């Protein structure tokens, strides 16, 4: 009889907050054993077992219909036979989770192993520590700073390494920006996708006829969220809801924006830009997620070496002058103009590198070397850049027009789809309007 009068943790609190005579209790953040037992029952026996445990524990239904369906759809069998876990007490269908007591909410959830070393540098060599710490927030309502355009500018102005963590990736134009950065400018790109969004990403690749042969400098990998494991051994994985972009290890774009057409045109989103020491937190999070990721497309096992310190010669020789100048012009502000000198808050490392710069008391700088190989080693031979035959103002004006060309034309110029017509389209060479 006493069992029927038992109240679960959530139900008891609901009764207290409804009553005017009960004093507020101290906040309790401990695990809910009744909720754990009910979740285990849902994994092992379905909805009927879930409701039965809720009735026995005197607990309320704490899962929404969407959450309950997700748990049942994502449930996975244990890797080993159930009798090895429970011995003779385990039945033919495994352990009865309602008869097991546990002091933790995730009874068998194991902590992730130490991530593989993606890059290693001393504190003085960390690129993000050379930038001033700042935080900027962008909303969808600001029309002159469209979030989709901000993301695309960030991609087109990255010169060395681009790291992306995303839940859904189906925007073909953003994909073209990434392909152009990797195949035309030698930028190494690593995309970590939520496991649930891999199918949609592959559908997009099939529609535009993109295969592994087009991803020579890109690594597409999948990653899951946290793992919930029941006493019986059945488990399910959560989703990746984190979304951020790290550009050249100097600044981060993070927010609610997903790489979809709807997010770029109708969904309301928020985007934040971080520079300075805050980037280190995203760097560490990416290390852990990369360590548990699995290859999907592109580079399967990138070579993990430390980046070349500034001023040291890279192992694969000198980079071309055009690529070196692009790296020198890299700024932590992806939304500013191309001239870093017009922004006093950004670092300007190429102020005296050009022939038209004013005379300085110090000697001319040494030949440029590749300042940063990225966390996966030297770029592939296909990623090497050659000097441009015309390095005048027109080249600088039209160098970023890939972000403003139609999707089909971008794929054609990347050599990924056959051209519809060989005629030249002069109207596409107009200067972009921001």
UniProtKB/Swiss-Prot annotation:
GO BP annotations listed: cell population proliferation; epidermal growth factor receptor signaling pathway; positive regulation of adipose tissue development; white fat cell differentiation
Region (DUF1669): 1-298
Alphabetically ordered keywords of this record: Cytoplasm, Phosphoprotein, Proto-oncogene
Signal peptide: none
Subcellular location, record wording: Cytoplasm
Recorded GO MF terms: identical protein binding; phosphatidylinositol 3-kinase regulatory subunit binding; protein kinase binding
GO cellular component terms listed in the entry, alphabetical order: cytoplasm; mitochondrion
Membrane spanning stretches: none
Region: Disordered, residue numbers: 76-97, 308-399
PTM-bearing positions, type Phosphoserine: 301, 327, 348, 357
Biased composition (Pro residues): 358-369
Principal subcellular localization: cytoplasm
SUPFAM superfamilies: Phospholipase D/nuclease
Pfam families linked: SACK1 (PF07894)
Compositionally biased tracts (Low complexity): 320-332, 348-357
Family annotation (InterPro entries): FAM83 (IPR050944), SACK1 (IPR012461)
Post-translational modification: Phosphorylated upon EGFR activation in a breast cancer cell line.
Top-level taxon of origin: Eukaryota
Disorder association: FAM83A is considered a proto-oncogene. It is overexpressed in various human tumor types, including breast, lung, testis, ovary and bladder tumors. Elevated expression is associated with elevated tumor grade, decreased overall survival and resistance to several drugs. In cancer cells with FAM83A overexpression, may be important for the activation of RAF1 and phosphoinositide 3-kinase PIK3R1/PIK3R2 regulatory subunit p85, even in the absence of stimulus.
Complex formation: Directly interacts (via DUF1669) with casein kinase isoforms CSNK1A1, CSNK1A1L, CSNK1D and CSNK1E.
PANTHER family: PROTEIN FAM83A-RELATED (PTHR16181:SF29)
Role noted for this protein: Involved in mitochondrial maintenance during adipogenesis. May be acting by playing a role in the maintenance of normal mitochondrial function.
Family, as annotated: Belongs to the FAM83 family.
Domain notes: All members of the FAM83 family of proteins share a conserved N-terminal DUF1669 (domain of unknown function 1669) domain of about 300 amino acids. This domain mediates the interaction with casein kinase 1 (CK1) isoforms. Therefore, it has been proposed to rename DUF1669 the polypeptide anchor of CK1 domain.
The name this protein goes by in its record: Protein FAM83A
Naturally occurring in which organism (per UniProt): Homo sapiens
Gene name of this polypeptide: FAM83A
